[in-house]
Amino acid sequence: MMKTYLFDFDGTLVDSMPVFGKMMKHIFDENNISYGEDFIKILTPLGVKGIAEYCINELKLNMTMEEFFKTVEAYFYEEYAHNIPAKKNVIEVLNTLKKEGASLNLLTASPHFTLDVCMKRLGLFDLFDNVWSCDDFNTTKTNPEIYKMAAEKIGVPMEEILFLDDNYNADKTAKQAGMKVCGVYDDSSSEYETEIRSITDYYIKDFSELLSICFS
């Protein structure tokens, strides 16, 4: 049985990607910013600071960093604190793993002000040994070093950790860093399913499938 897990949050444990996509499209449209269909794939591993820098520097969004943060914070907090649900079977599976003695850890691009309140509302926060935002490491999930730093903090060799994420770039980087990787289906990344399957050790469409991997 795999004993140590490192989970993504958005699109992996909770059904939040439609909220993120809707908000970013609203910001882009209001500011006449053109964007490709793959913008979610590009933005989600970056963290709030990285997203702001990318939008302002690369997409020429006419906002200051502070203005961007205020816009995002107000929109996101309301959704994460009150509305965003856990994905199907997530709560049950995480509780099962915890009862079996697994170490549950989380690494997400989301900031703590939305992450923590959402996890506590869903009853997930206390199941985890570590809950990290990329901000805690001052880097993003596209940098292999973040996975090495997380493994060091957990105190387990890289190859003994199963990383789970719905994002292709994060999965690819974690795999290159030396972790075992399980891709997770999400509607927002469904078009990249074949790509994700090609670079991961496992792939699940429903969270209940994780148990067969864990106990194999």
Q: Predicted regions: what is each one?
A:
Residues 13, 86, 104, 139, ...:
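Conserved SAM-binding loop
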Residues 27-28, 47-61, 118, 150-151:
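Helix-loop "lid/cap" segments that line or gate small-molecule binding pockets
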Residues 78-106, 112, 116:
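Short, acidic loop-to-helix structural element flanking the phosphoryl-transfer center
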Residues 21, 25, 48-53, 65, ...:
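An amphipathic alpha-helix signature
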Residues 1-41, 176:
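Active-site neighborhood of HAD-like aspartate-dependent phosphohydrolases
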Residues 54-92:
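Metal-dependent phosphoesterase signature
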Residues 1-3, 95, 111-112, 116-216:
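Asp-based, Mg2+/Mn2+-dependent phosphohydrolase catalytic module
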